[in-house]
Regions:
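Sec/Tat-exported extracytoplasmic proteins
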Residues: 64, 92, 97, 107, ...
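Short, glycine-/small- and polar/acidic-enriched structural segments
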Residues: 39-169, 175-178, 187, 194-200, ...
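N-terminal secretory signal peptides
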Residues: 1-16, 20, 24-30
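Short, solvent-exposed loop/beta-turn-alpha elements that line the ligand-binding surface or hinge
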Residues: 68, 219-228, 294-304
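Conserved C-terminal helix/tail region of periplasmic/extracytoplasmic solute-binding proteins
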Residues: 311-337
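C-terminal segment of N-terminal export signals and the immediately downstream linker at the start
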Residues: 14, 33-44
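Pocket-lining segment of extracytoplasmic ligand-binding domains
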Residues: 100-101, 182-274
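Secondary-structure end/capping motifs
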Residues: 243-318
Length: 337
């Protein structure tokens, strides 16, 4: 079945309604531990069961790295990013993984979320190996599959880059098709879409079959002022959590870094994780392992100057979908520990 171009609501900008809060509150009640057994060091993290975050979380739990650093990590399964956002706002979980641009936007709107690095991996823009599309300018009039919806950070970075360097508005000059990444991969392989903007882990199987990266997202980020080694994704939690769980930012960061150290060097650990990775071939397995390792950031906080430059570039391009109306980095976005 061929997908039709359509628009969906900006879920990042969508206000959290009373109904959504009630639903999340119900989830919180179901997930809450009994009062007597609920200790202050229990941290609930919302994650997709099959996402790349699950690999790191499983490593933390398998090796007891949470307990080693003084807390207990509890996994709360979620269906998607919007669900995680709502659960965090409602107190149904303590930690989610998202980008610091979203955190800055939420802080400008009165939230108290903070960010510590998780991964510097971002998406890929791919075309078929024999495609006539050679540059972003060739996407005019083409159908582009986009995973994550209109607020996907990689899609917005590409659009901002196209406006800045080529005066092209891909939102108007091309047809965007928003769908789940697995479905988009199928549509791409059936030639129902001309290009695909998808998450890094879904790009590797396509690359293995010859798909060509139209432009490197690291080059896009660099042009927009962001150091490509600056992680966009991170663990996000409220300052209130940091106050009630002493040193949690440091503890969580150390557990994450310890897990990444294992995943960076231990081949046996990846063999253990393979059932979680939903891969059918050794080639895909090796590609995903290499991709995760390539996304491991330095054990430092993002460069605030580079972050400001990126937000300014988004402002100049007119993109408010991701950053909101305020083009400055909100004070306190990056956790201090």
């Amino acid at each position: 079945m061929t997908l039709s171009p359509h628009r969906i609501k900006d879920t990042n900008a969508m206000p959290i309604t009373r109904r959504m809060m009630l639903l999340a509150g119900s989830a919180a009640a179901l997930l809450a531990l009994p009062t007597k057994s609920r200790a202050e060091d229990i941290i609930r993290i919302a994650t997709l069961a099959s996402g790349t975050l699950a690999w790191e979380i499983d490593t933390i739990l398998h090796h007891g790295l949470d307990r080693k650093f003084g807390f207990t990590l509890s996994v709360v399964p979620v269906a998607g990013k919007q669900s995680a956002d709502v659960m965090l706002a409602a107190g149904a979980c303590d930690v989610i993984v998202t980008d610091w641009i979203w955190v800055s936007r939420q802080r400008h709107q009165g939230a108290d979320y903070v960010f510590i690095p998780y991964s510097k991996q971002i998406g890929s823009l791919l075309v078929k190996p024999n495609s006539s599309i050679k540059t972003l300018a060739d996407l005019k009039g083409k159908k582009i599959g986009v995973a994550g919806g209109p607020t996907d950070k990689s899609w917005i970075l590409i659009r901002s880059f196209a406006k800045k360097t080529m005066a092209i508005d891909l939102e108007k000059d091309s047809e965007a098709v928003f769908a789940a990444p697995r479905l988009l991969n199928e549509e791409f392989e059936r030639d129902h879409i001309d290009a695909i903007m998808t998450y890094w882990q879904f790009s590797y199987p396509l690359k293995a079959k010859g798909a060509r990266e139209l432009i490197a997202l690291s080059d896009v980020a660099k042009t927009l002022g962001l150091d490509p080694d600056t992680p966009l994704l991170g663990y996000v939690f409220s300052e209130r959590l940091a106050k009630t769980h002493s040193g949690i930012a440091t503890k969580l960061a150390r557990a994450s870094q310890a897990a990444k150290l294992i995943l960076a060097k231990d081949e046996a650990e990846w063999i253990r994780l393979r059932p979680l990775m939903n891969v059918e071939t050794d080639q895909d397995f090796e590609a995903l392992k290499a991709g995760f390792r390539a996304g491991i950031p330095a054990a430092t906080m993002p460069n605030k100057v580079a972050a400001e430059r990126l937000l300014q570039a988004l402002s100049e391009s007119g993109d408010t979908h991701l950053r909101g109306e305020n083009a400055t980095l909100a004070s306190g976005t990056f956790a201090e520990f």
